[in-house]
């Protein structure tokens, strides 16, 4: 009772100070967070039966007490001229924003959008943007799981058997199966190849576009997301045969690649996922075909929309599948982005890192990347903007509880005001971050759009070459695990690290890169391999992580090792203890470390190991048993580093930094930790904006980081742009899971 009375008194005093500040014309948005949270804490929060309600209440009251007092102190300090005011611009009018150079813009300035889902007209817009950035309809399918009975596709599905999917009973949002969330009804799993399906979809699109004609209050028209598609109908078989004929022209050429004896393309079967491992060359073509035919349907959908709506930017996608073994069933984000259908790149990130926004940023070109339903962790919202996102709507903030069929009861644990798992401090952080994203849009966009001189290869061939059934249980496979692991380990190296693709490499993307990393990219097409090696000869630096470049896209052995003068004597598997097939972050700690030294730096590797033979002069480091750990070759004006085993994260950061220095990439900012602290998990980058140097520092750990910043450029002082407090003596405290943005003056 005493704590509640104290908190209520502090909130009352803050309310009075807010009123006075408003009368002075002072910004009060940050201070208003705590009175609003008090209403949430007292009227909306749920508690699980196993929780200590008294302890939960004390925690909430303590937060409100401390927050209210600090907010009052800040208002008073600003009024007395002792602190700078953090002035937040108004929320943008979506009808007046333009798309230009990867962002939604008001004039020249980027308008970054941080919204909470399902809040389009509420008091929450004091802090968060309107989450209705787009108007949405399941146009690709002609309906969704909620409204299918009211759409033309329903009648077609009842009347024409060829509208029914064949050989695949998972709707994946096209349209409804027995496991569909929040709805009860008979399965409606459509075939997109049927003319009756296409006719019904076209009618639905016409109706939808007529209803939304003249819309000027949204940024984009969303043709929906979370789509995946597979069908084994007769029309698909005919499409498959025609696709193969266009690709190969002569079936003998295809037979030579597949090691088969088909008499014609019409006799080539449609492989099932469980058969993928039996003929991986044939599977690669089938998986490629499935991606292609789905993108073609998306293009057709876009053409139908453009009959009625010629201008509104469109978006659609299933980016989740870009990092999933089921990639072959989804929408190919690269081909979709290059197709001209979309004006905004759609994102939906579930992962606990920034790999997806970084990948989509690499594909987007001048299109903004917008996450329409962010399911990641709160502390990576701001880093996601710093990796290229232009807009994010976070899941979710519902103002009233309700229940619908097939909805898991624990879904309410993810709604911010009701959740008993999301602490009240996270609500306060989200509200502060939303204000800072709006206030610092120019600086965040500059940091997020800076050039990436280092790139990791996102290999579509590797994604398609994984037999789905082999990786379905754990949701990953060696290439995908290596890509994510190396990407995350690279973040604390102080260097801009992006992604490139096989298609982009063939289009000359490496001309803007200094370093390319192959993260276990085993299956790489020959022309891509050759383009990479030519780039190295011209002065590039290549890091090859095992088991890259061992085969082509059809899983046929590659001659890369021979071309490089290397020989693999054998491959020693990782000593996994529980029957696993992949080394991941979850089992790596159980494995022995393999130490070696290169260029005076002691490093450790983990997992499988390649035993290589090469010229002695090319060995840059050896394991303790004398086996080469790193091979370094000079090729023309460039350098190639071949790692015989995967480095553990801290060693990878050291190795990447060492290679970067040798390639002429010296970080402009050095970040070290004060005694008793660590900078090991601090991600940081530096860029320039209109003559100013800017940096962000993201502390991706559960401990506060006491940092020392040293620059390679001259400056008079440093300013923490989030707090508007000076960084004295280059010493900066970054709390756990927080991000600082610093201006060097």
Regions found by a protein language model. Give the residues of each.
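Mature N-terminal, pre-catalytic/accessory segment of carbohydrate-active enzymes
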Residues: 1-142, 188, 199-206, 214-215, ...
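Hydrophobic targeting/anchoring helices
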Residues: 71-84, 179-185, 309, 315-485, ...
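Short acidic, Pro/Gly- and aromatic-enriched capping/linker segments at domain boundaries
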Residues: 79-104, 234-243, 615-631, 723-727, ...
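Catalytic domains of carbohydrate-active enzymes, especially glycoside hydrolases
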Residues: 115-154, 339-344, 380-391, 489, ...
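A short, well-structured beta->alpha microelement
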Residues: 118-124, 322-325, 489-509
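Aromatic-lined substrate-binding rim segments of carbohydrate-active enzymes
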Residues: 122-188, 205-208, 301-308
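Polysaccharide-binding and catalytic clefts of secreted carbohydrate-active enzymes
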Residues: 178-351
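A conserved amphipathic helix/loop scaffold
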Residues: 519-745
């Amino acid at each position: 009772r005493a704590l509640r009375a104290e908190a209520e008194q502090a909130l009352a005093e803050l309310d009075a100070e807010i009123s006075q500040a408003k009368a002075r014309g002072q910004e009060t948005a940050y201070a208003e967070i705590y009175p609003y949270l008090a209403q949430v804490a007292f009227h909306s929060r749920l508690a699980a039966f196993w929780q200590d309600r008294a302890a939960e209440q004390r925690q909430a009251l303590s937060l409100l007490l401390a927050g209210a007092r600090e907010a009052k102190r800040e208002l008073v300090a600003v009024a007395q001229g002792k602190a700078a005011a953090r002035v937040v611009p108004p929320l943008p009018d979506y009808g007046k924003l333009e798309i230009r150079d990867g962002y939604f813009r008001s004039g020249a300035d980027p308008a970054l959008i941080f919204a909470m889902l399902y809040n389009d007209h509420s008091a929450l817009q004091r802090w968060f943007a309107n989450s209705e950035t787009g108007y949405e309809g399941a146009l690709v399918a002609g309906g969704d799981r909620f409204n299918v009975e009211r759409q033309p596709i329903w009648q077609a599905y009842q009347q024409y058997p060829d509208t029914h999917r064949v050989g695949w009973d998972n709707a994946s949002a096209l349209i409804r199966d027995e496991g569909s969330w929040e709805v009860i009804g008979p399965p409606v799993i459509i075939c997109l190849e049927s003319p009756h399906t296409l006719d019904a979809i076209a009618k639905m699109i016409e109706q939808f576009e007529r209803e939304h004609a003249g819309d000027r209050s949204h940024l984009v028209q969303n043709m929906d997301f979370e789509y995946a598609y597979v069908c084994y109908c007769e029309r698909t078989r005919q499409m498959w045969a025609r696709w193969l004929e266009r690709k190969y022209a002569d079936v003998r050429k295809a037979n030579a690649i597949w090691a088969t004896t088909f008499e014609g393309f019409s006799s080539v079967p449609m492989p099932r996922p469980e058969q993928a491992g039996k003929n991986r060359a044939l599977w690669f073509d089938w998986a490629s075909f499935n991606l292609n035919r789905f993108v073609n349907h998306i293009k057709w959908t876009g053409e139908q929309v453009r009959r009625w709506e010629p201008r509104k930017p469109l978006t659609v996608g299933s980016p989740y599948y870009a990092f999933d073994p089921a990639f072959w069933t989804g929408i190919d984000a690269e081909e979709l982005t290059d197709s001209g259908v979309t004006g905004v790149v759609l994102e939906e990130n579930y992962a606990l890192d920034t790999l997806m926004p970084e990948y989509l940023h690499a594909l987007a070109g001048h299109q903004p990347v917008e996450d329409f339903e962010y399911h990641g962790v709160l502390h990576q919202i701001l880093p996601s903007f710093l990796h290229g996102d232009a807009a994010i709507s976070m899941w979710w903030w519902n103002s009233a509880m309700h229940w619908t069929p097939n909805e898991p009861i624990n879904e309410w644990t993810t709604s911010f005001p009701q959740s008993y798992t999301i602490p009240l401090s996270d609500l306060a952080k989200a509200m502060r971050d939303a204000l800072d994203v709006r206030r610092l849009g120019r600086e965040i966009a500059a940091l997020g759009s800076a050039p990436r001189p280092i790139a990791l290869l996102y290999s579509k061939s590797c994604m398609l070459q994984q037999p789905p059934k082999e990786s379905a249980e754990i949701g990953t496979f060696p290439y995908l695990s290596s890509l994510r692991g190396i990407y995350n380990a690279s973040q604390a190296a102080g260097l801009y690290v992006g992604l490139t693709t096989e298609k982009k490499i063939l289009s000359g993307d490496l001309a803007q890169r200094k370093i390319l990393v192959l993260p276990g990219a085993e299956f790489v097409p020959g022309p891509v391999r050759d383009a990479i090696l030519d780039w190295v000869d011209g002065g590039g630096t290549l890091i090859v992580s095992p088991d890259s470049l061992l085969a082509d896209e059809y899983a046929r052995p590659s001659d890369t090792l021979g071309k490089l003068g290397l020989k693999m004597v054998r491959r020693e598997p990782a000593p996994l203890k529980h029957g696993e097939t992949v080394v991941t972050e979850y089992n790596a700690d159980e494995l022995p470390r393999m130490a070696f030294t290169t260029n005076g730096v002691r490093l450790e590797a983990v997992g499988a190991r390649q035993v290589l033979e090469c010229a002695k002069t090319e060995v840059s480091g050896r394991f303790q048993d004398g086996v080469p750990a790193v091979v370094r070759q000079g090729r023309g004006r460039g350098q190639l580093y071949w790692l015989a085993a995967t480095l553990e994260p801290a060693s990878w950061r050291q190795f990447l930094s060492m290679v970067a220095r040798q390639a002429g990439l010296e970080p402009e900012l050095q970040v070290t930790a004060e005694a008793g602290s660590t900078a090991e998990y601090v991600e940081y980058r530096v860029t320039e904006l209109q003559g100013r140097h800017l940096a962000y520092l993201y502390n991706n750990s559960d401990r506060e980081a006491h940092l020392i910043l040293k620059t390679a450029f001259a400056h008079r002082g440093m300013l923490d742009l989030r707090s508007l407090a000076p960084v004295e003596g280059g010493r900066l405290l970054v709390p756990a899971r927080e991000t600082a943005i610093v201006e060097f003056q």
